[in-house]
């Protein structure tokens, strides 16, 4: 196919110009909802959508499920919003449809998961990640680690606030 660029809220807030890049541009409904809280940016986004420069598209459930699985395996579930997960799922779907897909986001967790999904990524205000991380949740009090994030962020054993740390670092997938 061609090139597809998936835009995160941060890209739209930073003023990413869709007319400067030869590619199809996409975003997801939840990003559009986040932008609609700001009048000026809402107007710019609506103009880009109405003029055909940006397409708003929801990912298929198959890609949502696969992306949620990867997010969980990487320990990024607490760091990513529903909009982030939806955006990454759309990127995975576009890649599956044959597009050369790049996610534009300054969020390091989005970039981390995009790398694992085999998507390109680019930041506007940041250089982007240099290595890929898998995260684990741990208790600094009793030193236990947890596979799944605890809902309240508190250790069920000793009551200490839980923290995240990298459990594995590796070079980026290319």
Q: What are these language model-derived features?
A:
Residues 2-95, 99-100, 108, 116, ...:
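Active-site-proximal, substrate-binding regions of enzyme catalytic domains
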Residues 24-31, 119-131:
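Short hydrophobic/aromatic-enriched beta-strand-loop microsegments
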Residues 101-103, 121:
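Hydrophobic beta-strand scaffold residues
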Residues 132-135, 151:
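Short metal-coordination and nucleic-acid-contact micro-motifs, chiefly zinc-binding Cys/His arrays
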Residues 138-142, 155-158:
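Short cysteine-rich clusters marking metal-coordination/redox-active sites
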Residues 147-154:
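Short linker/helix segments within small regulatory modules
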Residues 158-167:
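Short Cys/His-rich micro-motifs in 6-15 aa windows
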Residues 166-174:
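Long, charge-rich boundary regions
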